Amino acid sequence: MKNYRTESDSFGEIQIEEKFYWGAQTQRSLENFKIGKQKMPEILIRALAILKKCAAQVNYEFGDLEAKIATSIDKATDRILEGEFEDNFPLVVWQTGSGTQTNMNMNEVIASIANEELTSKKGGKSPVHPNDHVNKGQSSNDSFPTAMHIATVLATKQQLIPALNNLLTSLQDKSKDWDKIIKIGRTHLQDATPLTLKQEFSGYITQIEYALERIEDALKKVYLLAQGGTAVGTAINSKIGFDIKFAEKVAEFTKQPFKTAPNKFESLAAHDALVEFSGTLNTIAVSLMKIANDIRLLGSGPRCGLGELHLPENEPGSSIMPGKVNPTQVEALTMVCSQVMGNHVTVTIAGSNGHLELNVFKPVIIYNILQSIELLSDSVNSFVTHCVKGLEPNIARINDLRDKSLMLVTALNPHIGYDNAAKIAKEAHKHGITLKEAAKKLNLLSEEEFDKIVVPEKMIG
């Protein structure tokens, strides 16, 4: 049999199961928004706990919280950050667009934990009040966007950047000895002039290097925090200097360069910084899609495709075709990239709907951004472990395709002209003979002249 306690808010009393620490507003949200199962991301909850910890410290230093209250809030946030109350943050993304109910969920749980410590009884509003103490000098309108920025930075630094560095290092290590492997290039999915396998992979390496640079550039605005703007950006009910001191506390706690936003009206009404950051995630997805698809194409086969790369064989690929092995890591990564691109569309639409003084698409913005970060991070690490590290060049196939390519004829342009070189290529293709044989047949070059000019090793820059 479940036990219940009575909590109350401005709408009256409501029953809450005794084992939970949340209060009336959280319970109402649970009952009013039974929409989907997409809960607020755990790292956003952590960001809110960090926010409340730092706010309580500043309020104490400003003389607005007595020591007992501030200390109890501080201890409660520590316990939340240690993961002790994970089941007490049950709200879904599909709620008020300001994130008010999740902000109050955090306020109520912190107050309840603190009150249990001070009175041996959870819940209630005394001696620690969720609004008057935990939320002091704050509004959901500045607290939730602040938590959005903190969560984005933490997820990026803890998950995405390490994953991309892992991929970068693996690509560099894998390709460093491939500078002598000369293969045929392809443009428009047609044969082109030669390059080395290392040169081909250097393009992928640079894409990832640029991705890391883009992240750092896009984070510059995400480091700016809305806290202190309160309801509409005017800082009503917040003391002068609270915003600056708060940002310093968050920076100190997280070891990240957070600062107070210079214009709080922009920070509440718009989320351009996060839309821009989502655009960076979208660009990274574009880069990864290209890299993964190239590796898939180069590894196609084993007998009837390009077959220039051997991809690791991780599991059976077909329920009907015995012995078939598929590029499953590539498929997983490219599906993630598709999801991230879709997430960016959602973030773009949500960001464009910041009406007047408050954008009320905040939960869906941060949900999609954090999902994109998580999916990209996990899929990249999986791709590295189960694909990139096991890539091996198929030297025999690479040499065979290179030597058969008609586009080696490009080396003849400076010597016999474009038109004559084209005649050789067409003649070779039409009759299924080599370029050398076609050049001799057309009386344009001797075998000796051809061998002196058409040297793949001299065509790679």
From Swiss-Prot:
Stretches for region Disordered: 120-140
GO process annotations (BP): fumarate metabolic process; malate metabolic process; tricarboxylic acid cycle
Catalytic center residues: 188, 318
Keyword Phosphoprotein on entry: no
Binding site for substrate: 98-100, 129-132, 139-141, 187, 319, 324-326
Family matches, as PROSITE patterns: FUMARATE_LYASES
Catalytic activity: (S)-malate = fumarate + H2O
Similarity-based family: Belongs to the class-II fumarase/aspartase family. Fumarase subfamily.
Function: Involved in the TCA cycle. Catalyzes the stereospecific interconversion of fumarate to L-malate.
Other known facts: There are 2 substrate-binding sites: the catalytic A site, and the non-catalytic B site that may play a role in the transfer of substrate or product between the active site and the solvent. Alternatively, the B site may bind allosteric effectors.
Name this polypeptide is given: Fumarate hydratase class II
Species for this entry: Rickettsia felis (strain ATCC VR-1525 / URRWXCal2) (Rickettsia azadi)
Gene: fumC
